[in-house]
C-alpha cells in the first residue's frame, strides 16, 4: 500500500500513476515525496508540482541522459519534478550538505522504501548536520 492517501485530488491521481510506473522498474529502490504536497500545502491544481526524490541503481552518469531516460514515464506531463540519485549519490549528498536533499529527507514523506534506504539516510543526517532555522550547518567530526 502506498502512503499517499493524504495527498489531495487531483494530485493524488497523478502521483499514483507515476509511482506505479516507477516501482515497476527493477532499478528503483526508494521514492520520497517532498515539497508542498508532502507538507500538505499544495497550491490549487496545477500550480504545485509533484516533487519526488527517486533512488535507483544503474543510472546514467550524465544528468541530461538520466532525465531523458525516464522522461517517457511522465507521458508528457510537466507536473512532475523529480531528482534521481543512486544510493551512493544520496550518501554523498548527505555528507556534502546538499540542502534540498537534507530538507527532503527531513520533511518529506517516504512513499516506497522496501530496502530502508531513505530511513537510513534520514538517520545519517543528524550524524553530519545540525539545522539552525532554515540553514543546515555541518558538524565538526
Set out the residue ranges of the language-model regions.
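Catalytic core of pol beta-like nucleotidyltransferases
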Residues: 1-27, 38-46, 57-141
